């Protein structure tokens, strides 16, 4: 069985290790930066951006890959699984549409609201920091601030842990919007969960 793992982080290293402990499995990898641990385990490594869908699909076809495991969210967001499946290559990871629950925080919150999932936090999305300030004030600064898109686990900031008070919260909202952190000039703010 030829297995391709996309991604070069610790999560993917653990997956690669498990693949190599399986009988009759051959590991191939795609990663942006070389992870020496994954390199040692792999029959072959393609050093490439994990969002380069065309290169990943071509590599998978060339190596006659039976199954692809995608670790990071960014390749899921750009539809790597969708393209692999169009080319008859199986993947155990979600399609772009299924991964949206992880890649778009606003969409996820709206989905939960639409289906009346219990335990919803109060939230709003903003493209204007002045309007966001009112929402932050309503919660006395006790909020979580989340860029809408992917930030590699580095974008969410929570009062008490990452900022203190309304002024610092608004400053981070301004930064997210002006710098388009997460790829969009938009931020999701929700009440802080205790």
Q: What role is predicted for each listed range?
A:
Residues 50-54, 129-130, 166:
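Structural motif corresponding to alpha-helix initiation and N-cap regions
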Residues 1, 24-25, 64-65, 87-88, ...:
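Short coil/turn connectors at secondary-structure junctions
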Residues 92-155, 160:
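A conserved helix-loop-beta module that forms one wall/lid of the active-site cleft
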Residues 80-87, 106, 158-161:
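Glycine-rich loop at the start of a catalytic domain that most often binds anionic cofactors/ligands
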Residues 67, 110, 118-121, 142-144, ...:
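Conserved ATP-binding module of the ATP-grasp superfamily
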Residues 33-34, 149-151, 193-194:
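Glycine-rich beta-alpha junction loops
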Residues 1-97:
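ATP-binding N-terminal substructure of ATP-dependent carboxylate-amine bond-forming enzymes
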């Amino acid at each position: 069985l030829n297995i391709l793992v996309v991604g070069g982080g610790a999560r993917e290293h653990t997956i690669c290790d498990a693949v190599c402990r399986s009988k009759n499995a051959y590991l191939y990898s795609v990663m942006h930066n070389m992870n020496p641990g994954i390199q040692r385990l792999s029959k072959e490594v393609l050093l490439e951006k994990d969002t380069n869908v065309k290169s990943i699909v071509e590599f998978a076809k060339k190596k006659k890959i039976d199954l692809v495991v995608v670790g990071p969210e960014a390749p899921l967001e750009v539809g790597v699984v969708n393209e692999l499946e169009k080319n008859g290559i199986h993947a155990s990871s979600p399609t772009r549409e299924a991964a949206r629950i992880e890649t778009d925080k606003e969409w996820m919150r709206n989905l939960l609201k639409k289906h009346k999932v219990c335990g919803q936090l109060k939230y709003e999305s903003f493209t204007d920091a002045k309007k966001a300030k009112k929402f932050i004030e309503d919660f006395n600064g006790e909020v979580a601030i989340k860029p809408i898109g992917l930030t590699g686990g580095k974008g969410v900031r929570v009062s008490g842990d990452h900022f203190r008070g309304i002024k610092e919260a608004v400053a981070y909202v301004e930064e997210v919007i002006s710098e388009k952190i997460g790829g969009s000039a938009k931020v999701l703010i929700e009440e802080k969960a205790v």
